[in-house]
Amino acid sequence: MDINQNLGNLMKEAQKMQQRMQEAQQQLSQLVVSGESGGGMVTIKMNGRHDVTEVKIKPTLMDEDIEMLEDLIAAAVNDAVRKIEKASKEKISQLTAGLNIPTDLMGGKEGE
Protein backbone atom coordinates (compact mmCIF):
# COMPACT_ATOMS: atom_id res chain seq x y z
CA MET A 1 0.00 0.00 0.00
CA ASP A 2 1.54 3.34 -0.98
CA ILE A 3 1.72 6.45 1.20
CA ASN A 4 -1.05 8.29 -0.69
CA GLN A 5 -3.43 5.40 -0.20
CA ASN A 6 -2.47 5.19 3.49
CA LEU A 7 -3.04 8.92 3.92
CA GLY A 8 -6.39 8.70 2.13
CA ASN A 9 -7.47 5.87 4.41
CA LEU A 10 -6.23 7.78 7.44
CA MET A 11 -8.29 10.83 6.44
CA LYS A 12 -11.41 8.69 6.03
CA GLU A 13 -10.84 7.15 9.46
CA ALA A 14 -10.28 10.61 10.98
CA GLN A 15 -13.59 11.83 9.55
CA LYS A 16 -15.37 8.76 10.96
CA MET A 17 -13.72 9.37 14.32
CA GLN A 18 -14.79 13.03 14.35
CA GLN A 19 -18.39 12.05 13.66
CA ARG A 20 -18.27 9.35 16.34
CA MET A 21 -16.78 11.81 18.84
CA GLN A 22 -19.60 14.29 18.21
CA GLU A 23 -22.16 11.52 18.72
CA ALA A 24 -20.41 10.41 21.91
CA GLN A 25 -20.32 13.95 23.28
CA GLN A 26 -24.04 14.28 22.62
CA GLN A 27 -24.75 10.97 24.36
CA LEU A 28 -22.49 11.83 27.30
CA SER A 29 -24.11 15.25 27.75
CA GLN A 30 -27.43 13.47 28.26
CA LEU A 31 -25.97 11.00 30.77
CA VAL A 32 -26.95 11.58 34.40
CA VAL A 33 -25.17 9.89 37.31
CA SER A 34 -25.72 10.00 41.06
CA GLY A 35 -22.87 10.49 43.48
CA GLU A 36 -23.39 9.57 47.12
CA SER A 37 -21.67 9.93 50.46
CA GLY A 38 -22.46 9.15 54.05
CA GLY A 39 -24.36 6.01 53.08
CA GLY A 40 -26.81 8.00 50.97
CA MET A 41 -27.13 10.90 53.40
CA VAL A 42 -26.00 13.25 50.60
CA THR A 43 -26.82 12.56 46.95
CA ILE A 44 -25.68 14.63 43.98
CA LYS A 45 -26.95 14.27 40.41
CA MET A 46 -24.56 15.34 37.68
CA ASN A 47 -24.84 15.31 33.90
CA GLY A 48 -22.16 14.40 31.38
CA ARG A 49 -21.06 18.03 31.11
CA HIS A 50 -20.19 17.92 34.83
CA ASP A 51 -23.11 20.19 35.75
CA VAL A 52 -24.58 19.43 39.18
CA THR A 53 -28.32 19.26 38.54
CA GLU A 54 -29.59 18.19 41.95
CA VAL A 55 -28.44 18.05 45.58
CA LYS A 56 -30.34 15.99 48.17
CA ILE A 57 -29.46 16.20 51.86
CA LYS A 58 -31.19 14.08 54.49
CA PRO A 59 -32.89 16.43 56.97
CA THR A 60 -31.13 14.77 59.92
CA LEU A 61 -27.82 16.14 58.63
CA MET A 62 -29.02 19.69 59.09
CA ASP A 63 -28.61 19.28 62.84
CA GLU A 64 -25.03 18.03 62.45
CA ASP A 65 -21.71 19.84 62.35
CA ILE A 66 -21.49 22.09 59.27
CA GLU A 67 -17.96 20.86 58.49
CA MET A 68 -19.22 17.28 58.30
CA LEU A 69 -21.99 18.34 55.92
CA GLU A 70 -19.48 20.20 53.74
CA ASP A 71 -17.24 17.13 53.62
CA LEU A 72 -20.17 14.89 52.66
CA ILE A 73 -21.22 17.25 49.86
CA ALA A 74 -17.67 17.38 48.50
CA ALA A 75 -17.40 13.58 48.66
CA ALA A 76 -20.71 13.14 46.81
CA VAL A 77 -19.62 15.55 44.07
CA ASN A 78 -16.29 13.73 43.72
CA ASP A 79 -18.12 10.39 43.49
CA ALA A 80 -20.29 11.73 40.67
CA VAL A 81 -17.26 13.16 38.83
CA ARG A 82 -15.49 9.78 38.99
CA LYS A 83 -18.58 8.07 37.55
CA ILE A 84 -18.81 10.58 34.68
CA GLU A 85 -15.08 10.19 33.93
CA LYS A 86 -15.40 6.39 33.90
CA ALA A 87 -18.37 6.56 31.52
CA SER A 88 -16.45 8.96 29.26
CA LYS A 89 -13.41 6.67 29.11
CA GLU A 90 -15.60 3.68 28.31
CA LYS A 91 -17.33 5.58 25.50
CA ILE A 92 -13.99 6.70 24.01
CA SER A 93 -12.69 3.12 24.17
CA GLN A 94 -15.76 1.93 22.29
CA LEU A 95 -15.19 4.57 19.62
CA THR A 96 -11.54 3.83 19.01
CA ALA A 97 -11.90 0.03 19.08
CA GLY A 98 -13.17 -0.23 15.50
CA LEU A 99 -10.82 2.22 13.85
CA ASN A 100 -8.48 0.92 11.16
CA ILE A 101 -5.51 3.27 11.42
CA PRO A 102 -2.28 1.83 9.92
CA THR A 103 0.26 1.56 12.72
CA ASP A 104 3.17 2.38 10.39
CA LEU A 105 1.73 5.90 10.05
CA MET A 106 1.38 6.19 13.82
CA GLY A 107 5.08 5.61 14.51
CA GLY A 108 4.81 1.87 15.12
CA LYS A 109 5.27 -1.19 12.99
CA GLU A 110 2.50 -3.07 11.23
CA GLY A 111 1.08 -5.76 13.52
CA GLU A 112 2.06 -4.14 16.82
Swiss-Prot record:
Provide the assembly information: Homodimer.
Tagged with keyword Cell wall biogenesis/degradation: no
Concerning InterPro entries, the annotation shows:
YbaB-like_sf, YbaB/EbfC
List the subcellular locations. Cytoplasm, Nucleoid
Q: Which family does it belong to?
A: Belongs to the YbaB/EbfC family.
| Organism taxonomic ancestry | Bacteria, Pseudomonadati, Pseudomonadota, Gammaproteobacteria, Legionellales
Keywords, sorted A to Z: Cytoplasm, DNA-binding
Q: Which domain of life is it from?
A: Bacteria
What is the native source organism of this protein? Legionella pneumophila (strain Corby)
MF terms per GO, please?
A: DNA binding
Please state what the protein is called.
Answer: Nucleoid-associated protein LPC_3038
| GO CC annotation terms, alphabetical | bacterial nucleoid; cytosol
Q: Does the keyword Iron apply?
A: no
Chief localization: cytoplasm
Cited function: Binds to DNA and alters its conformation. May be involved in regulation of gene expression, nucleoid organization and DNA protection.
| Pfam families the UniProt entry points to | YbaB_DNA_bd (PF02575)
